[in-house]
From Swiss-Prot:
Family recorded in the similarity comment: Belongs to the complex I subunit 4L family.
Compartments in which it is found: Cell inner membrane
GO CC annotations, alphabetized: NADH dehydrogenase complex; plasma membrane
Organism ancestry: Bacteria, Pseudomonadati, Pseudomonadota, Alphaproteobacteria, Rickettsiales
Alphabetical list of Pfam families matching this protein: Oxidored_q2 (PF00420)
Reactions it catalyzes: a quinone + NADH + 5 H(+)(in) = a quinol + NAD(+) + 4 H(+)(out)
Domain of life: Bacteria
Molecular-function GO term, any one: NADH:ubiquinone reductase (non-electrogenic) activity
Protein name: NADH-quinone oxidoreductase subunit K
Length: 110
């Protein structure tokens, strides 16, 4: 007989937490290493947010509640809107100034 295995028999909560911490660390490393390009900074922040969402979903499945998964979907929706607005502002700034370097944007403060 063919036995259908549950995914949680092989992948425990610790595996998800390790994956999440690795993704968060990669995002943090990218944030610290690429401080001159705004697009790299936005991508690193999105990686860190993805790691948090992996934690929400993993704990939600572990506790057998849907609230973490629903919260994760809401966070992803807000993050997508935030990224779209940020990239639109960045595109307008690039059309006006011709550069998206952090040092050029800091000069706008006055």
């Amino acid at each position: 007989m063919l036995k259908i295995l549950n995914m949680n028999e092989y992948i425990s909560l610790n595996h998800y937490l390790i994956l999440s911490s690795l993704v968060f660390t990669i995002g943090m490393f990218g944030l610290f290493m690429n401080r001159k390009n705004i697009i790299n900074i936005l991508m690193s922040i999105e990686l860190m947010l993805l790691a948090v969402n992996i934690n929400f979903v993993a704990f939600s499945v572990y506790m057998q509640e849907l609230s973490g998964q629903i919260f994760s979907i809401i966070i992803l929706t807000v993050a997508a809107a935030e990224t779209a607005i940020g990239l639109a502002i960045l595109l307008i700034y690039f059309r006006n100034k011709g550069s998206i370097k952090i040092t050029d944007i800091n000069k706008m403060r006055g």
